[in-house]
């Protein structure tokens, strides 16, 4: 007698025999049984783990109760209250107060500012505010009878034809303080190197390699002028010295610091043509004489002659207005396309000048002064209530 049905149709329409169908159902039962056993075993393990955990100590329970109380008592309006307390006019006045006169680190005005911040914090309700002194190796621009930091075009090493502006004439009534420091790069070695000018893009190793291999320019004895960015200031000087350059000038090209059509200060927030980028030439963090340790008065200090973190050649910043005066007169072939900036000139490699500046050279005058001076951190404290022995830090610069 034939069975009423002898095949099982799959979803694909392919037939199976009854035997094959029975085997498939048996295999499915085993899989279901295995899953059930695994689930039971997992549940048993969780139950055992839960009841075998150590009980909380009284100290743990007290701490947990504090945290639960904080959550229960959380005031969701606190964030809005903080935002409502922000006063743009007060921020404006604070900024005006903190910037109304020069206060280079290690000077008397710098100490006065530290004390002002300390007292302001106390007046605003901080539990504690104090000054913490450190004796730091600092670098300063020319002072007193020292010559000015500048670049100049020279004839036979003595006759200056052009000098850069050295000061930013943006708003004289705001920038006329006689104590305003000259433009300089901190920790540049002093010196007065003279040489032909050569444009080296960003002053990276590959830029100097291009000059040598693709443009056949030997940088030995040259002054390199480079754009700000892509490498650290001190690293640019090290790169230039490695190919024989005797000095380096850095300027901020508008292509790197501004945007097309953007308004410059004081009409906008972008850098004007007289603005100069300042900063340190050091790449290592911390104080050079006490690397890795705070520069306290009792700290061991390396002899200054043993410190090798300073640039090997003089390095000086100038504005892009002054840089344009040099670059528009450079001789030599045009730069590769990736080297162009956005000054209204044809960028050329050099070396040397054309036209009325032919046979002229460039002198860099750097008169930096390095000395140990006392500086201050301002430390403010708000005592915690839940975990007073732990610290949360908020840090910012003020000098």
Residue ranges of model-derived segments:
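N-terminal hydrophobic or amphipathic helices/low-complexity stretches enriched
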Residues: 4, 12-16, 27-37, 43-119, ...
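Soluble metallo-hydrolase cores and metallopeptidase-like ectodomains found primarily
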Residues: 24, 28, 175-210, 285-399
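Noncatalytic luminal/extracellular "stalk/propeptide" segments of secretory-pathway proteins
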Residues: 64-77, 93-223, 230, 254-255, ...
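Short, solvent-exposed loop/turn and secondary-structure capping segments
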Residues: 110-111, 141-142, 209-212, 235-239, ...
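Non-catalytic positions within long, well-ordered alpha-helices that form the structural scaffold/packing
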Residues: 122, 241-242
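Proteins synthesized as precursors that undergo proteolytic processing into mature forms
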Residues: 223-235, 241
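Short hydrophobic alpha-helical runs that function as membrane-insertion/retention elements
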Residues: 224-226, 246-252
